[in-house]
Regions:
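Rossmann-like dinucleotide-binding core of oxidoreductases
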Residues: 235-244, 262-322, 427-435, 443
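Rossmann-like dinucleotide-binding cores of NAD(P)H-dependent redox enzymes
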Residues: 162-165, 169-200, 204, 256, ...
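A conserved short coil-to-beta-strand element within the FAD-binding core of flavoproteins
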Residues: 206-217, 323-334
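Ferredoxin-type iron-sulfur electron-transfer modules and their immediate structural context
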Residues: 2-139, 226-244, 331-335, 345, ...
Length: 443
């Protein structure tokens, strides 16, 4: 079945080190925490944070240097503290809803959460169990060991439920490991978080994949409930001429399989404007590409990628062509160049977002050795073979409790067309755990 032996190699790749706490570090943290107004309304928590972390309360504990208590407070809603503190789009979520931000800079919530997560690592703090009566004989299978599956597993195991994760790879973490480059998220942080989840009693079966060596009907017979959390890992395509040429890759597959070609002295074009596009561009640059170009059809202020990540990419030499669209990839057998067309942004009736429209006659070509599509993700076609209702876009259909058309099976995260962030995936996982526990209490 696999024992996760590969996990050691993957999770011990060199990455940025955590900042060790010293006097100066503590002073900066205290200054950041003192800036918080401890609002009673808590828009940062109730409106901004997908996980509804009790932000004012954990920051209050930091002010009083009660770091263990701050960690306990965060534990009530999340098990990904040091991770979300680093990679969440804080400016669009918690910090974007901070009252301080109305007339100035918001509280640096991300740094404070990361600080508490790091404190827990340095002081070997564990997740606390709160076992409920009559749950210890209940069994749940979770398909997928990414942020959503891991979060669901942790919140179930805390209550005493027997949880088994079925993971298609030989390591846990999902996109936390292969989808987010080491320079953004150190893998020792991911490993520590997963180790603590496994210490709750969660079991893992590696190299298990639905549709191949794992049968959902057999799992139904063995478990009380099943949670599908294996994500949407197939890169979307533009369906343009030349997209099947040698040298055209999907961004998700490239990051996941880490099977990059030799980029040295090559020109690489990335199509997209999200964090995957930025991550791929910065990764390719680090691997020696001569020129890295991102093509994005809208304006800079409309890029869904984090502002800081975009800025960092540009500082590293990544060129971004805003308001451009790829219309054709040219080459005989292999990519030689791409044809671009400039766009203008127009307000279409009924749309709240400006739409890009190609400017006729503005076509031009750009040399390219490789083209990487980073246009978002879609679910694998085999989802249709699970015997569950799906939407027209091939997402699994669920009700408000995340139950599928089979009430015994739940689904969440990108499988149901989620919002594409780690925090939202984790929120789905926590909600599913809570809903399953409520189901158990009925019988």
């Amino acid at each position: 079945i696999g024992d996760g032996s590969f996990q050691k190699n993957v999770l011990e790749r060199p990455g940025p080190k955590r900042t060790k706490r010293g006097r100066k570090m503590n002073q900066k943290i205290q200054e950041k925490s003192n800036y918080c107004l401890n609002c009673k309304i808590k828009p940062c928590s109730n409106k901004g944070c997908p996980l509804n972390n009790n932000i004012p309360e954990f920051i209050k504990q930091i002010k009083e240097q009660n770091y263990k208590e701050a960690y306990k407070i965060l534990q009530n809603t999340t098990v990904l503290q040091p991770i979300c503190g680093r990679i969440c789009p804080h400016k669009k979520q918690c910090e974007g809803s901070c009252v301080r931000g109305i007339k100035g800079e918001p509280v640096n919530i991300g740094d404070l959460e990361a600080f508490i997560g790091d404190y827990a690592i340095e002081n070997n703090l564990k997740f606390e169990k709160n076992i409920e009566e009559n749950l210890e004989n209940k069994k749940v299978a979770i398909i997928g060991g990414g942020p959503s599956g891991l979060t669901c597993a942790a919140f179930l195991a805390k209550k005493g439920v027997k949880v088994t994760i079925y993971e298609r790879k030989d390591f846990l973490g999902g996109l936390l490991v292969y989808g987010i480059p080491d320079f953004r998220l150190s893998k020792d942080i991911v490993k520590n978080t997963m180790d603590k989840i496994l210490e709750l009693g969660v079991e893992v079966r590696y190299n298990q994949e639905l549709g191949k060596n794992l049968n959902i009907n057999e799992l139904e017979e063995k478990y009380d409930h099943i949670y599908l959390a294996f994500g949407a890992n197939v890169s979307s395509k533009m369906k343009i001429e030349g997209e099947n040429l040698d040298g055209v890759f999907g961004g998700n597959e490239l990051l996941e399989n880490n099977n990059h070609p030799d980029y040295k002295e090559k020109t690489v074009v990335i199509n997209g404007g999200g964090n995957v596009a930025i991550d791929v561009a910065r990764t390719v640059k680090r691997k020696g590409a001569k020129e890295v170009i991102i093509v994005y059809r809208r304006a800079k202020e409309q890029m869904p990628a984090e502002e800081k990540e975009v800025s960092d990419a540009e500082k590293e030499g990544v060129k971004i062509l805003f308001q451009n669209n790829i219309v054709k990839i040219n080459g005989t057998d292999k990519v030689q160049n791409i044809e671009l067309i400039k766009t203008e942004l127009v307000q279409k009736e009924g749309d709240t977002r400006l739409s890009p429209v190609n400017i006729e006659g503005s076509n031009y070509t750009v040399k390219a050795d490789y083209v990487i599509m980073a246009l978002g993700s879609k679910t694998d076609e085999f989802v249709q073979n699970l015997g569950l209702e799906v939407t027209p876009r091939n997402y699994i259909k669920v009700n408000d409790n995340f139950q599928t058309s089979n009430s015994k099976i739940y689904a969440g995260g990108d499988l149901i067309g989620g919002k594409g962030t780690v925090a939202w995936a984790a929120r789905n996982g926590r909600d599913v755990a809570e809903n399953i526990i409520e189901e158990f209490k009925k019988y």
